[in-house]
Amino acid sequence: MNILDTRYLAERREALKQEILDSFLENFPHYEEMTESFEDIRFEEEEIESWKEDFEDELKEIEEIDDVENELGSEFEYGVTLVDVDDWEEYVEELLEDIGYIPKDFPSWIEIDWEATANNVKVDYMEVIYQGNSYLGRG
């Protein structure tokens, strides 16, 4: 099952920012005094254009994580479970068993419409996009 925790995304974003900052300071030491953090990097400077192209994927991923955070709001920093929409039905089944709504000794001959149940639970979740995949999370 493809599941993410937004705390992982926050850590990933910080690691990407640090990687970019380290490379920037290594390649452009004359900016060191005015560049204390990733946010201080002058991406608009002409002399760093070709260097910036090497980090296109990383910058895009940082932007995607920022978008996920903006969509989920303040809950992002506390850890929101994001479930790939393709795994949603399986996730709901496990969730309902784990929290006790479906007893462990539930008779196998009783059929549950998991698709309809998953759709009913989905009402409390919102969809976000990360790395080209759609995820559902409570925000």
Which ranges hold each PLM region?
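Acidic interaction surfaces
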Residues: 1-139
